[in-house]
Amino acid sequence: MKKLFFVTNVDWFFISHRLPIALNAIQQGYEVYLLSRDTGRKQFLQGKGIRFIDIPFDRSGSNPLHELKCIFQLYTNYKKYRPNIIHHVTLKAALLGSVAAKLSGQHHVVNAISGLGYNFTNGRNGILQKLIRTLIRIAFKSKSFSFILQNPDDVGMIKGFNLVPSSHIFLIKGSGVDLNEFVFSQAPGKTQLKVLFPARILLDKGVMEFIDAAKLLQKRFIGKVKFILAGDCDKENLAVLGEEKLRSLLVDDYIEWIGYQAQMFPIYTDSDIVVLPSYREGLPKSLIEACAVGRPIVTTDVPGCRECVKSGYNGYLVPAKDSRALADAIGLLIEDDAKRKEFGRNS
């Protein structure tokens, strides 16, 4: 039986972004493995027929010795099982996994990078960026590896490294959503509108800009609008806004945090406007879901986000890190019921 390896930093990301593909591969006769860090989903995945190999990825990536340990564990498993296809998902898994694949003589490798990341491309932290670029040149240079990127900016950047043939670089816009689950629905039409931030509570997702924009609009709309944050405080992410700090910024019956939601469809259907002021993305699943459900969107004019919105057609694009522009765009949609419905239909 052919073996297909999925390799990603953490099991919950695999469930949200790759599980349907894995289940389809099983139906086609593949023996599917997930090599990832177990955060409590191992038994669930094994129940789906997926073989689980625990690799202790550290998402903060601050210990080089730990990264070498992960490479060695990947190498050992690649040598032991000799998979027919290795599918690395996320930048870190692709970097470490590609080194392990080269060392073990594996050639059928697909690196799916959902976003190169704001910290890698923002022009700051030059030493870290130089290190990552060096690692990319070492890990990814191969005539046999293939790459899947989610937006044209990332495609251009990977092509600029000149590491693999251009014919091995593919643009697939996003990880997709199940349209049987995320179906178009009319906005709730309640007296109190809801503005939704559907993302982890991270600074580079624009969480502070969302909260700042809400507070700029507070005098005009308190009692008429509620701003909802639906996402986890990802404590392992260096860009996390801590839970204590977040709670200090909430406003009763105006800015509310509902935490991680396993089922997002009812959250979208109960919302009127979706907002993601991120600094950079691959192509955010949350915005694809919002489009599928038929919600107007306010997001930033940055790689990944701009691919989901045609400004003035299904939402508005605003500059990153601009709370005032964000507030103005949200305010336009709050005040214009007809525009919200039009943009929602166009999504």
Where are these regions (language model features)?
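Membrane-proximal helix-turn-helix segments that form the acceptor-binding/catalytic region
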Residues: 21-28, 72-75, 129-148
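Glycosyltransferase donor-sugar binding loop
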Residues: 36-40, 198, 226-241
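Donor nucleotide-sugar binding/catalytic pocket of nucleotide-sugar-dependent glycosyltransferases
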Residues: 53, 133-184, 197
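Conserved donor-binding/catalytic core segment of Leloir-type glycosyltransferases
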Residues: 186-205, 210-215, 227-228
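Nucleotide-activated donor-binding/catalytic signature segment of Leloir-type glycosyltransferases, i.e.
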Residues: 231, 240-259
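Aromatic "clamp/platform" in nucleotide-sugar-dependent glycosyltransferases that forms part
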Residues: 260, 279
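Short hydrophobic beta-strand element within catalytic cores of glycosyltransferases
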Residues: 296-299, 309
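Conserved acidic donor-binding segment of nucleotide-sugar-dependent glycosyltransferases
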Residues: 311-312, 316-323, 332-338
